[in-house]
From Swiss-Prot:
PROSITE patterns documented for this protein: CYTF
Membrane topology: Single-pass membrane protein
Protein name: Cytochrome f
Localisation per UniProt entry: Plastid, Chloroplast thylakoid membrane
Length: 319
């Protein structure tokens, strides 16, 4: 009985210690909404919802365009490239987690059809490796090799990314078929506005929670602001604003509920795109070539036969 109590005590002590360390880690090293692929992997079983919406849009609220280019058709067991473009103005800077300006990072999630996967290094030709650069791709889940994520990586270098993809061979993979398949892309530039727990990052606008008068605004050494608002019923409401957004209000100003207290510093955004690719059957191509060849030969024989008939007619007329 005493041994059981000791085990329970040790278990509780370990649990409390781990919880304390995690709490301290969050306070000392605040979350960076720059690590968007990790957030999606940790919180969602699949990156694409039943509605077709990619879950990255839950944290990255602004919409921006993305592009994807793939071949119209590929042969089985061949390596092809999927080109992902995440365009943005390279001259602009974003607000970093510490409130200072910095360059934008980019990231992407590529949802391939079942059976398609990242090409192994030994199958990637040298010219394709040169296009890929130092990008590191990883599967969304160990069991989901058809879903690839990359980033965050520097946007100035990788606003255009090349994914090396290996097409499946239906003769080996019985889950693959010679069909037309959709490919889905989610791409982002810049940091998010909301963390997975629902809290705001410093890369978004902060609004007044109540209607009232601003009585004081204080800033700490790190640039964060504490805004005190007295409501019409004489309640004191304190709004904490992290370093990054620019304050639009001053002491003595009257504000309404949901009125912006800061600007919106976000310059990035998330976008979705899709494409289609055909897994082509080589026998079908061979059959098509044979058909075209037979049509050409038939036309040639028809012309020759016609000329021969004309010669016979001409000979009969001369006779």
């Amino acid at each position: 009985m005493q041994k059981k109590d000791v085990c329970e005590y040790i278990t509780k002590w370990v649990s409390v210690t781990i919880s304390t360390l995690v709490t301290i880690g969050v306070l000392v090293f605040p979350l960076s909404s720059e690590a968007y692929p990790i957030f999606a992997q940790q919180n969602y079983e699949s990156p694409r919802e039943a509605t077709g919406r990619i879950v990255c849009a839950n944290c990255h609220l602004a919409k921006k365009p993305v592009e994807i280019e793939v071949p119209q058709a590929v042969l089985p067991d061949t390596v092809f490239e999927a080109v992902v473009k995440i365009p943005y103005d390279k001259q602009i800077n974003q607000v970093l987690a510490n409130g200072k300006p910095g360059g934008l990072n980019v990231g992407a999630v590529l949802i391939l059809p079942e059976g398609f996967q990242l090409a192994p290094p030994e199958r990637i030709p040298p010219e394709l490796k040169e296009k890929i650069g130092n990008l590191y791709f990883q599967p969304y889940r160990p069991e989901k090799s058809n879903i690839l994520v990359v980033g965050p990586v520097p946007g100035k270098t990788y606003s255009e990314m090349v994914f090396p993809i290996l097409a499946p061979d239906p003769s080996v993979n019985k889950q693959a078929y010679f069909l037309k398949y959709p490919i889905y892309l989610g791409g982002n530039r810049g940091r998010g506005q909301i963390y997975p727990d629902g809290s705001k990052s410093n890369n978004t606008v902060y609004n007044s929670p109540v209607t009232g008068t601003i009585t004081s605004i204080t800033k700490n050494k790190k640039g964060a602001s504490t805004v005190t608002i007295i409501t019409t019923d004489n309640r004191e409401v304190v709004e904490l604003i992290p370093a990054g957004p620019t304050l639009l209000i001053s002491e003595g100003d009257t504000v309404k509920a949901d009125q912006p207290l800061t600007n919106n510093p976000n310059v990035g955004g998330f976008g979705q795109a899709d494409a289609e690719i055909v897994l082509q059957d080589p026998l079908r191509i061979q059959g098509l070539l044979v058909f075209f060849a037979s049509v050409v030969l038939a036309q040639i024989f028809l012309v020759l036969k016609k000329k021969q008939f004309e010669k016979v007619q001409l000979a009969e007329m001369n006779f």
